[in-house]
């Protein structure tokens, strides 16, 4: 249970970081 929870937490964190980086690059290109 704890392993699955930590795994999904890590996956969610990775997805959030990836989205943040993608949005940042998009804003830099728009400027």
From Swiss-Prot:
The 4 large subunits of the cytochrome b6-f complex are cytochrome b6, subunit IV (17 kDa polypeptide, PetD), cytochrome f and the Rieske protein, while the 4 small subunits are PetG, PetL, PetM and PetN. The complex functions as a dimer. This is Cytochrome b6-f complex subunit 6. Component of the cytochrome b6-f complex, which mediates electron transfer between photosystem II (PSII) and photosystem I (PSI), cyclic electron flow around PSI, and state transitions. PetL is important for photoautotrophic growth as well as for electron transfer efficiency and stability of the cytochrome b6-f complex. HAMAP family: Cytb6_f_PetL. Pfam families: PetL. It comes from Eucalyptus globulus subsp. globulus (Tasmanian blue gum). Belongs to the PetL family. GO terms for cellular component: chloroplast thylakoid membrane; cytochrome b6f complex. Coiled coil: none annotated. InterPro entries: Cyt_b6/f_cplx_su6. GO terms for biological process: photosynthesis. Its main location: plastid. Keywords: Chloroplast, Electron transport, Membrane, Photosynthesis, Plastid, Thylakoid, Transmembrane, Transmembrane helix, Transport.
């Amino acid at each position: 249970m704890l392993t699955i929870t930590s795994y999904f937490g890590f996956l969610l964190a990775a997805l959030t970081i990836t989205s943040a980086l993608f949005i940042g690059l998009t804003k830099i290109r728009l400027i």
